[in-house]
């Protein structure tokens, strides 16, 4: 299991060029940004908790690229990482988030009343709807760098806060280490639980250390509101249900998330946030809202159409396979979600998904009738 070696201070005895990683066959955002000069400039720096440049880039060094998506190739180990290593992270953020500038300010809107429509996506096409985000608790290191004690303290805090939720959000916590293999696998197969730590991002960044210690899932009684604890982020908050009522899913998401934040504040803890980057998370790809609003949608005709990728790009949407990022579409079912995280509010992102999915369904219906879709091609959003 590869883990970063950056705590070896002996490396500073070697010149920077001798320690610079071989990125010659790499295709990720980190590799595009990191030059020998930048490495030399940043390699001796560390955050107050001891996180170094080599810690940040190890996952991108060990994983040159991905056949389907452009990976980031770097992670943060604490809130200060984005500041101490801003010369690495700022260009990555600009490239990953559509030209987002170091002077830009992020906006947050968690008022579901501002969402137009979204309660009537056709269930003949939309099989399920889901909204997720991540949150990090200020004062703790992030998962690539946190200690066992920190991780256990985060778990304890989260479980105490979540146990105060009531009504439709009332539920219970299931620690990973007290589950049987069969129970774990069932929750994974049902798309409720995060996968076992086989992802290169988790392994190479050090996020899988001590697995499954202090990891688990909290969910309400009908499994429509879930919180993952200590996977890639301190908290992953998920609202999901069958069918196409994205409005209901988003309303539950906003209500639950706001209540969780209030409960943490009552214990004198707050979430990592700043006006420029919004909510701070482990992977730079999730900064800002951290929000992914997605549907599992049946598009057997449009999914094979030569313009499908172009349509999604213009709608600022992205597609994944039925089982997630590394998988194929089974039976013409795609996971379609917003492509952006930073620079747009939560409501704006969910609105893009709602409006875009309606158009995708209209296109699919045209193709079912053997008709052309050229006149439905959207302008670039």
Curated annotation (Swiss-Prot):
Q: How is it modified after translation?
A: Ubiquitinated by the ECS(ASB9) complex, leading to its degradation by the proteasome.
Give the protein name, as stated in the record: Creatine kinase B-type
Q: Name the gene.
A: Ckb
Q: Which family does it belong to?
A: Belongs to the ATP:guanido phosphotransferase family.
Question: Where in this protein does the record say Phosphotyrosine is found?
Answer: 125
Q: Summarize induction of expression.
A: Strongly up-regulated in response to cold in fat cells; expression is dependent on cAMP.
Entry's EC annotation: 2.7.3.2
Give the domain of life.
Eukaryota
Catalytic activity reads: creatine + ATP = N-phosphocreatine + ADP + H(+)
* Regions of compositional bias (Basic and acidic residues) in chain numbering: 96-110
Q: What happens when the gene is disrupted?
A: Conditional deletion in adipocytes leads to defective adaptive thermogenesis: defects are caused by abolition of the futile creatine cycle, thereby reducing whole-body energy expenditure and leading to predisposition to obesity.
Keywords in UniProt for this one? ATP-binding, Cell membrane, Cytoplasm, Isopeptide bond, Kinase, Membrane, Mitochondrion, Nitration, Nucleotide-binding, Phosphoprotein, Transferase, Ubl conjugation
Report the PROSITE patterns cross-referenced here: PHOSPHAGEN_KINASE (PS00112), PHOSPHAGEN_KINASE_C (PS51510), PHOSPHAGEN_KINASE_N (PS51509)
Annotated ATP binding sites: 128-132, 191, 236, 292, 320-325, 335
């Amino acid at each position: 299991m590869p883990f970063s070696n950056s705590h070896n201070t002996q490396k500073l005895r070697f010149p920077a060029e001798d320690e610079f990683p071989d990125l010659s066959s790499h295709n990720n955002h980190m590799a595009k940004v990191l030059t020998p000069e930048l490495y030399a400039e940043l390699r001796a720096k560390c955050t107050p908790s001891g996180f170094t440049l080599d810690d940040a880039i190890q996952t991108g060094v060990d994983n040159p690229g991905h056949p389907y998506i452009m990976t980031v190739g770097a992670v943060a180990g604490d809130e200060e990482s984005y500041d101490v290593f801003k010369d690495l992270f700022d260009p990555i953020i600009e490239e990953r988030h559509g030209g987002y500038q170091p002077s830009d300010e992020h906006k947050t809107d968690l008022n579901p009343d501002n969402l137009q429509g979204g309660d009537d996506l056709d269930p003949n096409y939309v099989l399920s709807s889901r909204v997720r985000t991540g949150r990090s608790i200020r004062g703790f290191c992030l998962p690539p760098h946190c200690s066992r004690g920190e991780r256990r303290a985060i778990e304890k805090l989260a479980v105490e806060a979540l146990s105060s939720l009531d009504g439709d959000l009332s539920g219970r916590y299931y620690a990973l280490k007290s589950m049987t293999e069969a129970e774990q696998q069932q929750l994974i197969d049902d798309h409720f639980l995060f996968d076992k730590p086989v992802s290169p991002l988790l392994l190479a960044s050090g996020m899988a250390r001590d697995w499954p210690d202090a990891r688990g899932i909290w969910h309400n009684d009908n499994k429509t509101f879930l919180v993952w604890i200590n996977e890639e982020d301190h908290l992953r908050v998920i609202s999901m249900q069958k069918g196409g009522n994205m409005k209901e899913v988003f309303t539950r998401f906003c209500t639950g998330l706001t209540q969780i934040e209030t409960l943490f504040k009552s214990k004198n803890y707050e979430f990592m946030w700043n006006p420029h980057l919004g909510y701070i998370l482990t992977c730079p790809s999730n900064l800002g809202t951290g929000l992914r609003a997605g549907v599992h949608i049946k598009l057997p005709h449009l999914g094979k159409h030569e313009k499908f990728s172009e349509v999604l790009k213009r709608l600022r949407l992205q597609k994944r396979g039925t089982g997630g990022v590394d998988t194929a579409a089974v039976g013409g079912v795609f996971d379609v979600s917003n492509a952006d995280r930073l620079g747009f509010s939560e409501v704006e992102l969910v609105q893009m998904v709602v409006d875009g999915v309606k158009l995708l369904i209209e296109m699919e219906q045209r193709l079912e009738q053997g008709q052309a879709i050229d006149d439905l091609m959207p302008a670039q959003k």
